[in-house]
Amino acid sequence: VKDIFRIIYYDGEAVFGLLRLYEIDRDSKWLEAAAKSFDHFIRDDYWQNHDHWLSYCANEITKYIPDEAYYEFGMKNAFDNLPFIYGRETTFPTFLELTVATKEMSLRMETEDLQKLLHDYPLAELEKTITKRAIYQLNGYFYPELAIYYKNPARIDGSFFIRHQSFRVRIDDVEHNISGYVRYHHLLKQGKLSAEAETVK
């Protein structure tokens, strides 16, 4: 039985895992289970959690099931929290993951004749936020000239840390940073993003 205030990170992560399994072997049971869970996310307004795994899920499941409700969920998950993400002083890497996944999904919506669903969302503000986060998160990168001041520079050089949590380095934070930056770089290479940061209104 779930606690009333339990976080939902693992729910989204589990569904994302099912969708990646489906991508590998095309066994319909994975997609059916993911869709059933995603319907639950929609019923219970999970988008209000603004979680990066939910953005990953929405981006992934709409590749196979282009349900407008799924797209709408993904858009709300990001845009309802966009000004907060833009202005946040922490270097949490999941913000970049969330916004980049939303951008990827919105690009597909443009090509799948779903522009009508995009009218209520300021896509330019999403791009500004992505660029701001990509630049800002470098405040949490252990450049050699920073790592040298720590006890074991070789161990942390080139990794990522969370400054407001005592310069903590954890493998999941490093993974989230790499994941976000790889997807960000991919969009830049495709010419789908500008590298210039601007102010979100």
Predicted regions and their residues:
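Residue-level signature of the C-terminal ends
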Residues: 21-24, 44, 61-64, 84, ...
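Solvent-exposed loop and edge beta-strand segments that line ligand/cofactor-binding
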Residues: 1-10, 27, 38-53, 60-67, ...
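Short linear functional motifs in flexible/disordered or boundary regions
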Residues: 26, 33, 46, 53, ...
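Hydrophobic core segments within long, regular secondary-structure runs in both alpha-
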Residues: 12-15, 19, 28-42, 55, ...
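Short, surface-exposed, charged/polar-biased interaction segments
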Residues: 35, 55-58, 62, 75, ...
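Extended ligand-binding groove/face enriched in aromatic
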Residues: 1-24, 28-32, 71-72, 132-136, ...
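CBM-like carbohydrate-recognition segments
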Residues: 69, 90-201
